Every structure is written in structure tokens, then in C-alpha cells.
Regions:
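Residues forming the flavin
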Residues: 10-368
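Single conserved hydrophobic/aromatic residue that forms the stacking wall/gate
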Residues: 1-9, 13
Length: 368
């Protein structure tokens, strides 16, 4: 990997280093692995990869940048000419159960509007069209931003999906429907097409979640402990989420979430003593350790989603290991009760909810 060394305004250089494994003891982890965009192989009907002038939103962003390959001028990749007619396809993969992505990628509507405005500002006599399913502009001043693109910059919005894109006589033929006009067919001859591809979880997110023992949803985005009350916390104590690793997010929401995670970490470190839930799992220790009912099968250790089950060796006075039993780490246990259900010898209980305690409560109710 590469590292940047030096000071701003002074000499700076990039130095290559080989990958290495670093082991550190930390008090908290903030997961900020971000997200990726859908592989364009998922929609061959759009012709990406087959036709050079069909690009993704990220590629268009680079074209429009002053530091990009064309110094900010919008030019076609095929011949370097300025496109006079451009089509933006929103929801390219998003909200499409057939592609396995039924969710909304959230950011596509806004950056597509921005890209269309940039095109109109740079190519004054050009025409821009946006195919969309619904305009989801849910942030502060987002709706006004989209209205400005339509009313002031003259971007043409067409409500409907694109069915097919192909090339004919040097033009890209975009075929779709306008659902606001009774699903009437629409055909546009474009010089360039930009696909607003869906946001998906990073490759390896599922493997990372399993290693860190944090939950994830069916789309491999990391799951928060509670969507309303604990949006930056995970079910594993000390591990927090920030940014688009949890779901596709824009910059303001990512910054707000990162600030919340930082506050949670600072609050954790400012405490002299860590506060934990009292209702945690405990292994039966009513008998002398040697006669513990735990048989050491460790099915509970395999089942525990928080890696809170450890192995404890019971030794005699000479240090000889007599038995290995399960032990619950109270700092990691979240009291979910999974280990209780898996324990064949019934050696684990939730503190405060043992069989004897629950039985006593039931008998007290019956007697009354």
C-alpha cells in the first residue's frame, strides 16, 4: 500500500510499502468500510461495456471534474466530441427485485440532478433527459435543488424505466416508456448515456461482519443495534458504525453518523467503569467446580453471536487440568439467551431468569 509523508506546504512524497498484519489492543472500533456500486454486468440491456459512450455516474463525475482527463469538459469517450444530447438513467439496478436489489440507493436522484445541471452549465445548447421511477429528494433543500434543475436549467425528466439501449448510425437509441402519459413509448437518439448504478455493500463485508461478530442484513450491509434508538451502535459492545457501510448514504448523513459514532466512543472512554446489562448468561457454579454440570461440549461457544463464551480449565492443586468448562465473559455478553437454548446439560441460565426463579414466580402467582 502507499503512504503519504511530509507536511502541507512542504515537500511531500508517496512511499510504497508491503502489506502487513498489525495487531493492536483497542477499546473501541468504528467500522467505516463504505459501499460500492453495482457491477454493470447485471444489466446487459443497457449496453455498458459494449458501447463506449455508455458510462456510469462515477465516470461522468470524473469527466466533469476540472482535474479530470478532459479538464472538466464533457466529451464522449469514443471520439472526444461534445455530446449534444445526453440521457441519464436513474435507478440502474436499484428498486429492482429481479436484479436482487429491491431497496432504494438513496443518493442516485440527487447526484443525477447535479450531473444534469453540470451538463447544462457546460454545454449550453445541449439537451439532457432523465429517466426516473420516482424522485426521492428527502433532505434539506433537496426538493428545491431538483426543481431548479427542471425549471431553471431545462432538464427534461421522464417518469419510466429504460427497456433497451442500442447503437444505430452512430447514435445511442434509448427506448423506454413515459408512465405519466399512459405508458406511451419513448425513443431518444442520444450521444451519451449515463447510468446511475445502485449502491451495494463492499466485497468482503459479510466475511468482515462474521469476523467482528456484528449483524448484517440480507444485502450484506452492517446492521445497527436499533434503527431509532441506537443507529450507530451494533449488538457487539464497543463496535460502532459510521457511513455507508450500514446503507447507502449521502455526505451530510455520513458526516452526522460519523460524529455520532465519535461521541459514543468518547463517552465510552470518559467513564471510569464500564456499565453493562445485569441480565447476562451465567454458567452453573452452585456445585464445586469439578462437579459442574457443564460437560464441555462448547455448543454454546459456537452458537454465541458475540463470542462471549470462553473456555475455563479446572485444575487441581498440582496444576493438572481436570476438566474444561464454559465461562461467560460479562463484558461481551448481551444477554440474548442463545447459549441457554443450545446448552444440552442445562448448565447456563440468564441471570435473574433461572428455571428456579421463573418457577417461583409462577407458583407465587398461582398461590395468589
Amino acid at each position: 500500500y502507499e503512504i503519504l509523508i511530509g507536511l502541507v506546504g512542504s515537500e511531500m512524497c508517496i512511499r510504497d510499502r508491503e502489506d502487513r498484519i498489525i495487531s493492536e489492543n483497542v477499546g473501541a472500533i468504528v467500522v467505516t468500510t463504505g459501499f460500492n456500486v453495482l457491477n454493470t454486468d447485471f444489466f446487459p440491456e443497457y449496453g455498458y461495456g459494449k458501447y463506449k459512450d455508455i458510462i456510469t455516474g462515477i465516470q461522468f463525475e470524473r469527466l466533469a471534474s476540472a482535474s479530470g482527463p478532459t479538464l472538466g469538459e464533457i466529451r464522449r469517450p469514443s471520439d472526444g466530441k461534445i455530446p449534444q444530447k445526453i440521457v441519464f438513467v436513474a435507478c440502474a439496478g436499484s428498486r429492482d427485485p429481479a436484479k436482487g436489489i429491491p431497496y432504494c440507493s438513496k443518493i442516485c436522484c440527487m447526484y443525477t440532478a447535479k450531473h444534469a445541471m453540470l451538463y447544462q452549465h457546460k454545454v449550453h445548447n445541449g439537451e439532457s433527459y432523465v429517466f426516473y421511477m420516482d424522485i426521492r429528494a428527502g433532505g434539506k433543500n433537496y426538493e428545491e435543488f431538483v426543481r431548479r434543475a427542471i425549471e431553471e436549467d431545462g432538464v427534461n425528466y421522464i417518469r419510466g424505466r429504460v427497456a433497451r439501449i442500442y447503437e444505430k448510425n452512430g447514435k445511442l437509441i434509448v427506448k423506454g416508456v413515459d408512465t405519466l402519459l399512459g405508458a406511451s413509448p419513448v425513443e431518444i437518439e442520444a450521444d451519451m448515456v449515463v447510468l446511475a448504478t445502485a449502491g451495494v455493500a463492499n466485497k468482503g463485508a459479510e466475511d468482515l461482519a462474521q469476523k467482528m461478530h456484528i449483524s448484517y442484513d440480507p444485502y450484506q450491509f452492517f446492521a445497527e443495534a436499533h434503527p431509532k434508538l441506537k443507529p450507530v451502535e451494533t449488538n457487539t459492545a464497543g463496535i460502532f458504525l459510521a457511513g455507508a457501510c450500514q446503507a447507502p448514504k449521502d455526505i451530510p448523513e455520513t458526516v452526522g453518523m460519523a460524529s455520532g459514532a465519535a461521541v459514543k466512543v468518547a463517552s465510552l472512554f470518559s467513564q471510569a467503569n464500564l456499565v453493562r446489562e445485569p441480565m447476562i448468561a451465567v454458567v452453573n457454579r452452585t456445585a464445586p467446580p469439578l462437579f459442574s454440570t457443564c460437560v464441555g461440549c462448547f455448543m454454546c461457544q459456537t452458537a454465541c453471536p458475540y463470542q462471549a463464551i470462553e473456555r475455563e480449565e479446572i485444575k487441581d492443586r498440582t496444576g493438572k487440568v481436570l476438566k474444561t468448562v464454559a465461562k461467560v465473559n460479562p463484558g461481551l455478553c448481551q444477554g440474548c439467551g442463545t447459549c441457554v437454548a443450545f446448552c444440552r446439560s442445562k448448565s447456563i441460565d440468564i441471570q435473574g431468569y433461572s428455571n428456579e426463579q421463573v418457577y417461583a414466580e409462577v407458583m407465587a402467582l398461582l398461590n395468589n
